[in-house]
Amino acid sequence: MHQQYYNKPLHKLENNIDVTNGLINQRRFDPRKVDVMARKGTIERWILNASLPVGFTIQGAKFVVESQGEHQLQAEELAWKDTVWVKNKTQILVKFDQASSGNYPFLFGVSNLMLEDMGCLGVLMVQ
């Protein structure tokens, strides 16, 4: 399934998750600041790196995991997800099917409540 996207030019985004300090890309969650803008109907390649194993989730989007570490996933392993366990470099293809609004943006980040409270989240706008 993900093979069909390999030949298309994709926007690439790298997210570095600092589990110890509760940061994404060395920043804390700020609900007034949009961290990622995406267009509805597009597909992006996100590369996730975490300092320690942690769950990662995206609201309002779905994705397939392309690879985890050196392991390239096979076609029979692929499924749409909204959460993935990141224990080393993880590469995902994110599809944005739903639009958000300025009043109701989506969030992305860790799925651990203590880390969310520390600010390990980002704001995602899809238009």
From Swiss-Prot:
Highest taxon above the source species: Bacteria
Record Pfam families: Cu-oxidase_2
Organism: Haemophilus influenzae (strain ATCC 51907 / DSM 11121 / KW20 / Rd)
Molecular function via GO: copper ion binding; oxidoreductase activity
Protein name: Uncharacterized protein HI_0731
